[in-house]
UniProtKB/Swiss-Prot annotation:
Protein name (database record): Homeobox protein goosecoid
Stated role: Involved in the development of the organizer region in the gastrula (Hensen node in chicken).
MF annotations from Gene Ontology: DNA-binding transcription factor activity, RNA polymerase II-specific; RNA polymerase II cis-regulatory region sequence-specific DNA binding
Family: Belongs to the paired homeobox family. Bicoid subfamily.
Record-level GO BP terms: regulation of transcription by RNA polymerase II
One Pfam family this sequence matches: Homeodomain
GO cellular component, one term: nucleus
Protein species of origin: Gallus gallus
Amino acid sequence: MPASMFSIDNILAARPRCKDSVLLPPSAPVVFPSLHGDSLYGAASDYGGFYSRAVAPGSALPAVGRSRLGYNNYYYGQLHVATSPVGPSCCGAVPPLGAQQCSCVPPAGYEGAGSVLMSPVPHQMLPYMNVGTLSRTELQLLNQLHCRRKRRHRTIFTDEQLEALENLFQETKYPDVGTREQLARKVHLREEKVEVWFKNRRAKWRRQKRSSSEESENAQKWNKASKTSPEKRQEDGKSDLDSDS
């Protein structure tokens, strides 16, 4: 056996590239989630920038299956292959690993050999957009929107609503459900919003009350310290003179 076969280049070249991405040949259709029986299709060539070539260009992918719901209520387009497995070379020759998967397999949305994890698209957006005609930049934008942290919607109250809420808060700190519903109809808000506002307002009121009590205690201590009798001051001065003599 020649010694060149044990060189570093040959050893590294023989190893399977586990970081290779799953491919889509140009002739294969891209299946997106079904919407009440209607499927959205797009050409695989539109997504050439997302997937590398791992099979021969002339090979076909038969038996296109259905998509499924991924994690966090996001749809993932899946391309299921019934014949030869398509995927990274390090995973094609091994049986399903169950809970222990190869590091090249995406943790979510990947259903074994032959599945293609497409760009995540929020399911509520799919009825209003033709996913098959999106460009690479638009798909990247969808990925960024998916990765962003979902921000909690914050209600902005008008001056009239705040005035009505404050007036009721001055009357009672804990209004019942009927009172909250009556106020909600008056200021055109939902009763849940009024309830949340009162919870936050009570928390703010307690903080203000606690801070004001601490300030009053500190003021009383300061007043007691400043109102020391002149006799006590003179006695302190005499004791200082005696100690010096």
